[in-house]
Amino acid sequence: MKNYKKYSGEELINLDEKGNAIEKDKEEKKNKFNFKYKIIIPIIFFILIIVCYYISFHYKKNIKNVFDETTIKNLKLKNRVFLGPITHNIEKIEKIVKNNISLVVTDGAFVGDFSISNLQPEKPFRIDDDKYIKEIKELADVVHKYNSYILLDLFHPGLMTADKPIYSPSADKSFFNKNLKSKAMTKEDILRMEDYFVQAAKRAKKAGYDGIEIHGAHLTLVSSFSSIKYNRRTDEYGGNDENRSKFIVEIVKKIKQAVGDDMIISAKIDSVDEEYGFTENGFLTLGKALEKSGVDLIEVSGANPVRKDKGPYFFNDTKKLADILNIPIVCIGGIKSYEQADYILKNSNIEYVSLSRELLKDPDIIKKWYLNK
């Protein structure tokens, strides 16, 4: 069928061979369809690219292996396994690091106003005076001999104290001696304690440590500032989650200023535990505040690290924190097998796992994991 055109008024009208007008809307529909096709297809294609990129990025991010080589700041780690804070005994640590542990976090070293803590069954580990630099350096040298790295855990027991002096954010009884009661720390007490942590970090640097960890878990002094149960202050260090984070944030900032950017700064914090006053909002707020303050690493533990239930104890909360932060997060607590470590890494944004008791019991466990993986 041939088409003819006839000029009618202001427009050309398509005619068939008998002179009848062809329906104008057919051509208009075709034009509209072509127009929509040209617009919609590129949009759909663009959306598919974004979705595929997101899936690919997320998938690659979680394809992590226990034995990946990684980097934190200037440290090139040989795998994703740490030794957590459980001992400062040189012989015990050497047995562990010679079997390929990438990073060691020491047992808690007292930073100042020394007092006995029931948390340490071994000889108290001290960093509250320059005379201890030589002693702690021996441990760092042993770890470095095996191409591993070491962080010094900086610690004050707070209410975990069996004798005086005793410090806490609010007046409370000692956990180990009910006849002992602390007074609420004054602003001067807080600033002095912050300086103890700073001086301890400077000593760690002189001793050749690769970094420090601020021990803010297990209801120690720093930990108790984050608890709504033990921190009942109404000043700038209490009253809301941001204020309760201030003590450890100030410590981080002052340490960074004192030791520079070449040292790793890690923070160990409590997961959610309503019984001890650690709320979910407080936990996440603290994590964000620490990231903003400049920490390189966060390790998540709990107010009560000794559990009877099957581990990993703190995985769910650690996973939540890893989902909202852009710094490496470490999962610790009850990790006993390669399968558990592998599951944690592949099913979250958690970057590292830390073992303590299992490595003390079996220093060869990482070598066995590697051979049997």
Question: What do these predicted regions represent?
Answer:
Residues 45-52:
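Sec-dependent N-terminal signal peptides of Gram-positive bacterial secreted proteins and lipoproteins
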Residues 8-11, 44, 286:
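Terminal low-complexity, poorly structured segments
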